[in-house]
Design a protein with these regions (language model features):
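Short, Lys/Arg-rich, polar N-terminal cytosolic tail immediately upstream
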Residues: 22-34
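N-terminal cationic amphipathic segment used for targeting or macromolecule association
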Residues: 8, 16-19, 49
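Extreme N-terminal basic, low-complexity initiation segments
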Residues: 2-14
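Residue-level detector of intrinsically disordered, flexible termini
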Residues: 17-20, 45, 131
C-alpha cells in the first residue's frame, strides 16, 4: 500500500465562484522509497513469470474466444484508452456491475456541476464494461490495466487523470 506524505485539499467553491484550480495530473507514485520500489519490482517479476507460464494458454484460448482476446489486449493496454476532448480527466473506477451502477449519481453530479471535467469510467470485468457502455454511452469507458507497474504507468500517462475516484475500495499494489 502506498503512503502519501502530502494531501492536497481542493477547497469547496461557492456557487458564484469559478471552479477551483486543479492539481497536476496523477502519473506516478509520489513517494516510492527504496523498500516500496523493491517490493514493486518483486511483484512485477511475479507478473512476468505468470505471463510466461500462462501466456501460451491465454493465447490458445484467445484464438477461439474473441472476447477473451479483447480482454487480454485491453488489460495489457494494447488497445488505446482513447483521446478525450481536452478537458481534465476524473477517473471513476468501479470494479464490476454494482460499482458502475452505484456511480451513476456521482457521474451525473460531475456532469452537471463540473462540466469543465471529463469523467472517464474504468472497470475490471467484462460485464462491468458492458453495463458502463450501456449506462454512459457518451463517456469513455476503459478497462483497468493488468497490475504491472509499467502497464499501470502507461495507463496513467495516457489518461493523465487529475483525480481518481474509487467507488469501492479495492487497491492493488501498483494502483
Amino acid at each position: 500500500v502506498r503512503q502519501r506524505e502530502e494531501v492536497q485539499e481542493v477547497p469547496r467553491r461557492d456557487v458564484s465562484d469559478a471552479p477551483p484550480a486543479l492539481p497536476e495530473p496523477i502519473r506516478r507514485d509520489p513517494n516510492p522509497g527504496f523498500s516500496n520500489a523493491f517490493l514493486h519490482h518483486v511483484y512485477d517479476l511475479a507478473w512476468v513469470v505468470a505471463v510466461l507460464c500462462f501466456g501460451p494458454v491465454l493465447w490458445w484460448r484467445g484464438r477461439r474466444n474473441p472476447e477473451l482476446r479483447e480482454l487480454v489486449l485491453e488489460r495489457l493496454l494494447r488497445r488505446s484508452v482513447g483521446r478525450g476532448d481536452g478537458r481534465p480527466v476524473v477517473l471513476v473506477h468501479g470494479v464490476s456491475v454494482g460499482e458502475i451502477k452505484g456511480a451513476r449519481s456521482l457521474v451525473k453530479r460531475f456532469e452537471s456541476e463540473r462540466p469543465d471535467l471529463e469523467p472517464v469510467l474504468s472497470t475490471t470485468t467484462s460485464t462491468g464494461a458492458r453495463v458502463a457502455r450501456t449506462l454512459y454511452p457518451h463517456l469513455r469507458v476503459v478497462r483497468f490495466p493488468a497490475d504491472h507497474s509499467r502497464v499501470v504507468e502507461r495507463f496513467f500517462d495516457a489518461l493523465a487523470p487529475t483525480c481518481v475516484v474509487l467507488v469501492e475500495l479495492e487497491i492493488w499494489p501498483n494502483f
